[in-house]
Amino acid sequence: MYVRSQTAGERVTESVSNFIERKLKLLVNKDKSQVCEVNQTKFLGYTIQKDGNLSIAKKSIERFNEKVRSITKRNRGVKIEQVIAELVPVMRGWLNYFHQARCKGLLKNLDSWIRRKPRCYRLKQCKRVITLQRFLERPGVDGWQSRILALSGKGHWRKSGCPQAHQALSNNRFDEAGLYNLTLNYDRLNNKKKPPCARACPVV
């Protein structure tokens, strides 16, 4: 329920709670009942902002991130293609539910982070220096630059953010592998990028 002030909210909460408990003989969950600013509440995973727009609640984002982390754990021992195949339905389902929120900036950051996770996963699979160097050289990374990264003492996560790793496992390669793109599909779901009109053909 939405009211004009904190005082009014507390008064209405007490009145409604009394009605529910005394008249309807039901128990009000005090832990889930609160009086606060509209942008501090969450409903079905959404938060309503002061301007009336929807945003995604922090807990909903955290749960999504945990699912991604679980799928991209570096010790799973499965092929990267399987990792991508498991990510796709999770990402698609999450966006289909939350696409009505104003969240394009968030989605761009998530896309970047999610692509880096399988990039890191794949680098870890190259357990030897020579294996990593050859993996980087295969898609066209300069041999000397490949060796620099392969010999680097950086951890796999830091390596995955380096230019050589981005070139070897580019965004285009992930697109070709079928990795779901949150930002592009957000535009599609909200009709911000309409597909080009088909060429008219005469009907005979």
Map each language-model feature to its residues:
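Non-catalytic terminal/accessory segments
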Residues: M1-V204
